[in-house]
Amino acid sequence: MKVGQVIAVVDIGSTKVCCCIASVDEHEHFDILGVGYCVCFGVKHGIIIDMDLVSKSIARAVEEAEKAANLRIKSVYVNASGKFVRSELIHSSINIGGRIVRHEDVKKLIYKSIKKNPKEEIIHSIPILFEMDSMVCTTDPIGMFSNVLNANVNVVTIPKVQINNIIVSLARCHLDVLGVVYSGYAAGLCVLNEDSNQENQIVIDFGGGVTTINFFYKGRFCGLETIPFGADNITRDIACGIRVSNLNAERLKTLHGAAFVSFDDKKNMILVPMQEENNVINLQQMPKSDLNEIIQPRVEEILKLIKEKIDKSVFKCDFANNFIITGGGSMLTGIREFVSETLKKSVKVQKMEDFSENFGIQIENDFATAIGMIKFALLSDDINLNHKDDSEKNDDIGFLKKTMSWLENNL
């Protein structure tokens, strides 16, 4: 990308919509120009269920980011998440004939791995490991001699109806879609550094409505698992258990909540805004233990499901020790220790960097997906089928282009 080129992304989550606008610097990195944030309604477990509400949330977040950046945006990268996102490792093979492997060979191999499905849209196709003549394994075969080139390709798909709803929601805000990025992949791109290219790691993204388990083989996204519970479930448990509004439940969780009950919690008193008759708010004291006794069972449930998913995964043996947690739920006090105890592994909470000192804000962990999408747009070596040359598109793979054309003519 050219220096000064603008990248805009929209992260549509179950609890918030985030818009980030960035520009490319001379070092092929980026500076954040503006951030917009809005509470999101109309999304459940990462899936849009009310397009009108979602579009309004997107519009507010984009407007806020545009004001901060002092510019208007027309096109964005957007995320996709939810339990219907699928990841499949597909083996593919082509004959090279003893010559040097070229970039075109790798593309041909990846395209060969794609299975046509009229109901699914491919959003990522990522080569994980190449094998040459059944002997040499490498992550980059280009420039090497081979007779036969094999590859395991991670193909990530999403139902076309789901991606269509995302595109229409953005089109209602007069925004075109440049590309769709799986949320867990983006979160991993955000928190993994260059050293990660030598390691196998699991990135657990604690979102609002969905928790995802994302497997990275030497920096390459190779698999995913999804749990339809997240930090918002904890908030609703608090609201129900203490009988406060969701807004006050979120504040209590943020200010006083912890993943487990500690010894001193019964001694520590907190103020709880209880709503009485006639909508009068009355502050009442409550032991901190009462709050955390509500939080702990839900955290235990989510972590139990995470452990079950990992234990059943084909990647279990290869990803034994390296765990990173991120997302809004990772900011809950004590979550690292609780995850480590449950999984019996060393766990790291990856703190986000302040990506733009000039912007004057600290980017928190719940912005990991948005920052990862900027990295995807800037640096990704993933072959995104939504950006292929027209000569290489077929009817299935060109779904996004056809959808956008339909929207332009009908909205």
Q: What spans do the regions from the language model cover?
A:
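Glycine-rich phosphate-binding loops at beta-strand->alpha-helix junctions
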Residues: 15, 158, 257-260, 318-342
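Short beta-strand scaffold segments in enzyme catalytic cores
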Residues: 17-22, 211-215
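Nucleotide/phosphate-binding catalytic cleft detector across ATP-hydrolyzing
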Residues: 1-14, 20-203, 220-222, 231, ...
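Core structural elements
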Residues: 80-83, 208, 327-328
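Glycine-rich phosphate-binding loop of actin/hexokinase-like ATP-binding domains
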Residues: 199-241
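Conserved phosphate-binding/catalytic loops in two-lobed NTP-binding clefts
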Residues: 103, 107, 342-370
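Feature representing long, continuous alpha-helical segments
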Residues: 236, 289, 293, 297-304, ...
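Acidic-glycine-rich active-site phosphate/pyrophosphate-binding loop
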Residues: 31-32, 206-210, 214, 340-354
